[in-house]
């Protein structure tokens, strides 16, 4: 039997994990084992919302050392994280300034300024990336305007996963899938766009040319002295999650469900027409030259904040209580900027309902019901937008990531979208990370080959849409009202 041992470091906005994958070549089986799990979260430092990258690095090294202490010879390591955020370094590799998080308010108003000065359509034609107020282009503009004293000291800007790879190997890399989330990469050249960089205030010398997934960045020397390759995987966690989505055919869509919900489809070509611009569709880079045509949805961030504020520890009990409530009494737009990082999420949700003359969700279950129903309805709207964009309906939706364990939300999604939902795998980002490592090690041929492995080894659950559910009737009523308005226009 031939085995490969690959380690995935998968960092999310609320937690991180070091996972060991064991791949058996002869039977093409893949097993995962959690080695180390640790918390991540936002911190307040010198007036900014930041990440504690030192704590994260310590946790990563602890997890890697645990694997080595078991006597396991690691064949490769890969790191994936969230997008858009970065760490600045001087010429000696020391940090400059703070690792500010995307939920910080320093970028307020800058996206509108960019659209006015450069032209919204021109930015979109160059980058193909959706307009989000915290994209790296606006973060860099905020930095250069608000902290000009830092500029002379900056020699390099590394996105978060590239920073941790650098800390392990001493080698710098700018991985393509994550680089595209910055809104600074030209969609035609796959290199940094000089016009967009100039507006951001950043120096092009801070960046190296983006590299596609599948190359070895450098080596980490383990405590036992072995040199272990660190692979540039699809380092944006959604890109890794999509790689592990067992998409079957061109009519399959995906929903990577976690702190954020990312809904989209794979395409060999980007969509940058006026329809895509109007819908704020993004064309993020994927593996093998594919595009992740998708839309960001605020996701379970709202629930995470409610759980924190209400000190709720028993999530299954909350979901059971939520399921007993009638649907669609409290509806908000989860993508409203007011929910990016409010002082109090519960109060913000209640205020949104009050301002739209709805009943006010008061208790824990009502707040959760509001979030789940609102997300499911937004999923239905986005899926419809995506189908219209490409001119073909979808036949199934694959929900992957930690959020796919929420069976109530999965069923609400199936009912609201009127589509078969396949939930799993849960550890999609980790698996996609491992998939690129196995391809780099010449164990697998390509992404489609890896998806066959995932389909046979992952635990998948199917949710069939119920047209008689409350939320399905609500969606039908909305569509009927919309059609009436269009006919009368």
Swiss-Prot record:
Belongs to the rhamnulokinase family. The lineage of its organism: Bacteria, Pseudomonadati, Pseudomonadota, Gammaproteobacteria, Enterobacterales. It is an enzyme of class 2 (transferase). NCBIfam families: PRK10640.1 (NF007925), rhamnulo_kin (TIGR02627). Involved in the catabolism of L-rhamnose (6-deoxy-L-mannose). Catalyzes the transfer of the gamma-phosphate group from ATP to the 1-hydroxyl group of L-rhamnulose to yield L-rhamnulose 1-phosphate. ATP binds at residues 13-17, 259, 304, 402. Substrate binds at residues 83, 236-238, 296. Monomer. One of its GO terms (biological process) is rhamnose catabolic process. This is Rhamnulokinase. Keywords: ATP-binding, Disulfide bond, Kinase, Magnesium, Nucleotide-binding, Rhamnose metabolism, Transferase. Its cofactor is Mg(2+). GO terms for molecular function: ATP binding; glycerol kinase activity; rhamnulokinase activity. Disulfide bonds join 68-222, 353-370, 413-417. The keyword rRNA-binding does not apply. The active site is at residue 237. GO terms for cellular component: cytosol. InterPro entries: ATPase_NBD (IPR043129), FGGY_C (IPR018485), FGGY_N (IPR018484), Rhamnulokinase (IPR013449). The keyword Iron does not apply. HAMAP family: Rhamnulokinase (MF_01535). It holds the Pfam family FGGY_N. It comes from the Bacteria. It catalyses: L-rhamnulose + ATP = L-rhamnulose 1-phosphate + ADP + H(+).
């Amino acid at each position: 039997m031939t085995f490969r041992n690959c380690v995935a470091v998968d960092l999310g906005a609320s937690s991180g994990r070091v996972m060991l994958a064991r791949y058996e070549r002869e039977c093409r089986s893949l097993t995962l084992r959690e080695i180390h799990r640790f918390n991540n979260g936002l911190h307040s430092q010198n007036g900014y919302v930041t990440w504690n990258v030192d704590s994260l690095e310590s946790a990563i090294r602890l997890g890697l050392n645990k694997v080595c202490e078991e006597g396991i010879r690691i064949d490769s390591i890969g790191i994936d994280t969230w997008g858009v955020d970065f760490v600045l370094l001087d010429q000696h590799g020391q940090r400059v300034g703070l690792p500010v998080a995307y939920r910080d308010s320093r970028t307020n108003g800058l996206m509108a300024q960019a659209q006015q000065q450069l032209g919204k359509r021109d930015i979109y034609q160059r980058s193909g990336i959706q307009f989000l107020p915290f994209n790296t282009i606006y973060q860099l503009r905020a930095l250069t305007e608000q902290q000009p004293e830092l500029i002379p000291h900056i020699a390099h800007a590394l996105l978060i996963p590239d920073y941790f790879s650098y800390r392990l190997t001493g080698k710098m890399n700018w991985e393509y899938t994550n680089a595209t989330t910055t809104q600074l990469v030209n969609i035609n050249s796959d290199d940094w766009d000089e016009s967009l960089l100039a507006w951001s205030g950043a120096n092009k010398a801070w960046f190296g040319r983006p590299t596609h997934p599948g190359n070895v960045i450098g080596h980490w020397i383990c405590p036992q002295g072995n040199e272990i390759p660190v692979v540039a995987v699809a380092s944006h966690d959604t890109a890794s999650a999509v790689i592990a989505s067992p998409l079957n055919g061109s009519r399959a869509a995906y929903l990577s469900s976690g702190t954020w919900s990312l809904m989209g489809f794979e395409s060999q070509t980007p969509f940058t027409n006026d329809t895509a611009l109007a819908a704020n569709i993004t064309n993020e880079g994927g593996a093998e030259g594919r595009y992740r045509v998708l839309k960001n949805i605020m996701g379970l961030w709202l629930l995470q904040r409610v759980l924190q504020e209400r000190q709720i520890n028993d999530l299954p009990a909350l979901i059971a209580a939520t399921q007993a409530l009638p649907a669609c009494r409290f509806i908000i737009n989860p993508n409203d900027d007011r929910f990016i990082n409010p002082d109090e999420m519960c109060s913000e949700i209640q205020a949104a309902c009050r301002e739209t003359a709805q009943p006010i969700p008061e208790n824990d279950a009502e707040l959760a019901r509001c979030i789940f129903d609102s997300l499911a309805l937004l999923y239905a709207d986005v899926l419809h937008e995506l189908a219209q964009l490409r001119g073909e309906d979808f036949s199934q939706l694959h929900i992957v990531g930690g959020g796919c364990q929420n069976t109530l939300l999965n069923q609400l999604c199936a009912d609201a979208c009127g589509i078969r939902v396949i939930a799993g795998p849960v550890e999609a980002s980790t698996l996609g990370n491992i998939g690129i490592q196995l391809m780099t090690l010449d164990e697998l041929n390509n992404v489609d080959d890896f998806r066959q492995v995932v389909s046979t080894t992952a635990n998948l659950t199917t949710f069939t849409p119920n047209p008689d559910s409350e939320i399905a009737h609500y969606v039908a009523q909305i569509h009927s009202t919309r059609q009436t308005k269009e006919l009368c226009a």
